[in-house]
Amino acid sequence: LARKAQAVHLEVFGALHTLPADDIGDGTLVLLGPAEPGFWAHVSESPEFTDGAPDPLDRWSARVISVLADEMDGTAFFPFGTPLRPFMSWALRSGRAWSSPVRLLIHDHAGLMVSFRGAVLLRDRLTLPPTGPFPCETCIERPCLTACPVGALTGADYDLDRCHDFLDRAQGTICMSQGCTVRHSCPAGHKYRRVNAQSAFHMERFHPCR
């Protein structure tokens, strides 16, 4: 699955054995995220990004990951649509993601830039891959706590209204065009190299009325 995913610019971001409470069947759930560098250049040339229909990234993810699941005789699940799937809980259980000091999810490879495009349930209970270290344990400066220019996102709280108010102003242009400064501040994600165009795409969906 990892090799097949790499061919479509996805990579394994974690894996876990399912529990009865998951109610998705028994087996190994493999979480998939964007493979960098090159993910955005790849998906932005797909039919979903040129047909003018809404939600191109979700539609690309659904098409591509469903094919991967079929090829592996597995089942695809997604962090969008219904029923809602607990991707954050699954990520935490994988041992490769944790809650950061600002309470956003942090990943051992992608840092605060972590995102999941989907998951594939394999029917066998496979040996799980090694997990990475919790990046925040060795992060002394913790720049994420002070990176937000208006203090909307701190270890104490996330003031969503203050965040949106800032993004409405001219000063918020850098966040809208390059992505959240808190996410960018995380040293764990500096080698992940997500391009600004992808961050801008997500910001436009987070804050569509500017």
Question: Would you name each region that the model predicts?
Answer:
Residues 1-210:
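Non-ligating segments of multi-cofactor redox enzymes
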